[in-house]
Amino acid sequence: MDIQEQFEGYLREEVDLLNKFEDSHFKQLEVFYTNSQADHVINKDKAQFSDLPFHTTLYKEVNGKRVKLGTLLNWTKAERLDTIRHESMIKDERLRRLIDFDYSWIDYAVVLQRYLDEGNVIAPADILKFDSDFINNIKHPTEKNNFLDIKVIKECETYILMKDDNGIRDPDILRAWELDSIPDVIELDVDGEVKKFNLRKEMIKRIQDEAPVYFFASVSLCSRNLDPNISEVKLWLEYFIGSEDFFGFNGPNVVVSKSLLAAKRFEVVVNHLRKVAAFELDDESKEVMTEWLKYIMIDPVYRSYKNRGAFGNLNQHVFARTKSEGLSWSLIDIGTTNFELKPTKKLAGSYVKKFNLVDDVLVEESLKDLRNEGLYKMADITRRMIDADITPENVKKGKLNRLALSYCGYTGSHSATAMVKQFNGTKDLDPNCDPMFVDIVKDNMKVYMQEGLQKYPHGSRKINRLDILFKGGTSSASSTNEHATVNGRFRYRSELYRERDVNSSTVFKTATAGQYRVVKKISAKLKSKNANIITHPMNFINSKVSDLDVVVNAGSRLVRGTRAKRIITPNYGTIYAASLMTVLPAVRLLSSRASNMGALSTQGSLVDRAPHDVMAPQLAVTSSDDVSKVCVAKDFGQFDTSQWGQISKAHADGVRSMKVHYSMGHDALVDLDLNDASFADLLEVTAMSFEKPLKYKMNGLVCESAGVKSGELTTQTRNTTTNISHSTVALDDYNNRAYRLNLPKLELVTDNKVGDDSVEVLRVVDGSPLTPEIAKLYVSCMQDHADRNHLEISAKRTIVGNNVAEHIKIWVFKGYLALDVFLDSVTSEKNSFSNLNYLEQVNILYDMAMTLMIRYCSVQACMTQFCNDMKLLNGIRAGNYTFIPTPKIICAYGTPEICLRAPEIRSFGRYLPIDKDEYSVLNDLVASLSTNKPKMEFVSQMIEQNGNKVHSLWLDHFKRKNDVNPNGGGIHISEGLKRLMPEYCEKHLNELVYKTLDDKVIRDYTSDIIISNICKGKLSKAPKLAFYANFYLSLTNTNGVDSPYLTADEGVKNVHRVIGLSYRNTLSTSPTSNVDRILRNNPGSAPAYLTGNDILGVLSDYPYQNWRTVVELLDITEPSATAIIEVATNQMHAYLADKDLNTANLFDNTSRTYDISDRTYPKFVNITSSLSNSNRRGFQIEAMKHVIYMARRGVAVLANTHPTKIGNTVYYDY
């Protein structure tokens, strides 16, 4: 069989897989919702919603063929479900109490009753009782007791949980205590006065704040896949049923019956089953994870938290003493920003002994800690991995402790306590710092400011400042006290209700039978930063000296890995605006990385690059025979808040040093107007915001935060400055000490510092091998200089060596890399998943699968989980109806458009040999699911009821600046162009403001429109494919390298072998991002409300010869005008593909590692020469999708657009 026939055969198999997926999907729905009772052909049968049965299958008929659209559920007929899940079937008293507690468990109760009827028993488990010593940890800081001498507290109306000799360990971590064992009310002595404290109520409140459970699907559906015969499920059932440790939901909030963490136990067992399956763990690894599951089930969050230290101590040493060979990467150019992974051959028998510093005492202590907890299997397997051979299975074994910490999903700690601990940081240490270190911090900040302002001087020019403010600069938070409000009533008509739904407030009858008017009251504040800038610009423009004393609302976020809650500290509006003008250039400087420079030049990090780019130097060092090269990774703790006092003053002075270059400044802070202020005065505002501790409030607590603020614009820049300075003094100190001790010197070759994360490559200057003496001395120097400057660093967690390295949770060993396991989670940090529309939910599940595939999972495991998860999605609900689309939409235009065996190749579904009519219907179905008309109708009604919210300052600022006649130009002015022209921009600006509202009624109305239109046969028309061509394949030569992604899917590694590894993702930047960059770098040359998406959208409606006129009508001037036209000329193909699909960009977490670039196109693609450059690039990408598909199977092919002879067959493109 020739290669073309093989390829076509593979695609036919893909269609068969899709059909099987669809069949299994609908069979699962029959399990959930009983068998379908009727078929409804939307373009033939009339839709009388009230007449439809509970479970209907929807079709569209085309050319005599029926195409399945999905399942429609009519909840007014839901009594049909009761015949299979009637309460009378539940005999076990515990199960009856379960459904009394929360009736949504009825389906699972039926499953469990059958299990019990078969003679099985569910025994009770022992639930943890309240520890009365905890009461001693409850503290009440007050002004009278000097806030317990905690200096950061300025006001307090709440309690905190602090260490006490008579208390419990880590009181701020929520325990799984039995509710009835927690005292309802206790008496506490507060400043000599006895006060009553509602302890049980406070503990229950903590559940939602510290251990919420937001599943991606309803818990009742998730539980249906929990077979009670599985041993791990039996363990959970001993709590859930045996001890009646029930949980349910009141809206998004967890409600419990018996213990505080009943829902977390459920999440733990679900996560365990998913991860064991997805990671395809071997029997030994399964035993380790089952041991862990049994251990943490007793007290999930705390038992995870208490082992974090031991796990971290051991995790860094995986493969540290391995003797196995790895890959071999060249060290050529490692000292420049052009360094790229390139393989090099090792000489036969050239094995050299490498070295990594391992603290054996710490290892043994950590192993002992694990064994003391009963985690013998975890301890043994982790210890073995220090010396183990490097294999895919051993990499997984080495990461089992990380996997274990992911079981609890998102958790946090007591909010007020977290705030005190985080703000206090290292305040108890000596406030004095090493003067040399402080000077280096200042000098580094000065250099970043100087080079940043030279490259991006726009904020120093008054004419640009409003444009910079409007753009907002970054996603960093800001806080103000004034916000616009929106009040009104949103109205729409619906046929998805019935008579008994009518009430006096939201659902009303109309004169038309079967139609109802839905009215929802709207009352909201426009709190988004972008909306606030448009509605209240004076909150950002008029700066007062007292603004640095304003108490700002702090935020918080939960994290995975059972760590303490993170407190977010944004800047006040005027301080944020000053930062945009002054230090944003330095932020951008450190976010870019120019080519053809020395690796140690002032530059950015590689944090946003593919992992093999980020870690390229470390991959080369750990694989090289040059044992004089050394990788060093530091581990800072509390880094933000440890930079108080003299360090923050050094940051401030580095900013202040720029004042000498600008006139009319004052020596101290003054009230100012952003538009007229001297740039020197703006620099002083920024400097003082660094130097002066700022106040934040949250949950009845006001605290003062010194050091780096975790939500400010310059968090990463300031952290990077201090990080580099610490490395500088530590290296200088090492070389001074080494000289005295007769040890060789070290020199820095390259580094990558991202905030508090740091990885360096050093070289032993005389070329001798790294030795334990060198490593220990360098670690000692790093520790000493942290101690001298009230920084917190763990010497025992510092990695030094040339066998293994780590940076930003990417581990490197002998030329291979492993990524983190904190990916797949059935829950999210906030209740955000349920607020997404159906296609967005599918995309998140898909992205999760793609991330797993490049890390630890096979395509089979990833897509099995993806398909199973899709079956659990709730579908689209409106009124009394739910529509669940066919899962085959994943291959349709407007979704990831994938095939199941090569899912990372987005928009490849168009090449599957699916029936033409069926594919057209699926595309139209996706277009119907993607409608944004309801959102725009909501915005329109709110504008009509609330009027203009755009501040007059902006309407005046955006008046046309060029002298172009808006009615001239000789071209037809489309509605899309008109709305973006300065003369008509008020409506557009108001839409930007109102669109920031995300009210539930918008989702309800959108769902209503989708269901109504689909059932009535009013499918939207899908856009035409931007690019499609028949390609003919022939064999060619491979061009790639052995993959460093050792545990990735085998097909992914085949692509690396056939095509190669990407380099800096040069083609992954979207056209809209490129236009946005032009606008950002040239403020004032275009109205600031324009985006790359706006401009390219309008240009795509016009022929090329009209583009200059369109740009002028948009009031875009030079230098942006020509640059934008150039981007549009070269990249309109990519925009057209991205515009309709939204997910069509080829680059995701997996495919961005593939070398799809100008250097691989000539080797794998042969495009007809008559195409324009723009179209040529579009078809080159389409052709590469075919090449990647075959490369996954280890076959290198050339994709041709013209007829070619393959074997005995000649293929023609008709």
Curated annotation (Swiss-Prot):
Gene: Segment-1
Catalysed transformations (reactions): RNA(n) + a ribonucleoside 5'-triphosphate = RNA(n+1) + diphosphate
Domain of life (superkingdom): Viruses
Species whose genome carries this gene: Banna virus
Biological role: RNA-directed RNA polymerase that is involved in transcription and genome replication. Following infection, it catalyzes the synthesis of fully conservative plus strands. After core assembly, which consists in recruitment of one capped plus-strand for each genomic segments and polymerase complexes, the polymerase switches mode and catalyzes the synthesis of complementary minus-strands.
GO CC terms, sorted: virion component
Entry's EC annotation: 2.7.7.48
Descriptive protein name: RNA-directed RNA polymerase VP1
Keywords: Hydrolase, Nucleotide-binding, Nucleotidyltransferase, RNA-directed RNA polymerase, Transferase, Viral RNA replication, Virion
One Gene Ontology term from the biological process aspect of the record: viral genome replication
Location in or out of the cell: Virion
Main subcellular location of this protein, as a coarse class: virion
Gene Ontology terms for molecular function: hydrolase activity; nucleotide binding; RNA binding; RNA-directed RNA polymerase activity
Domain RdRp catalytic, chain residue ranges per copy: 610-805
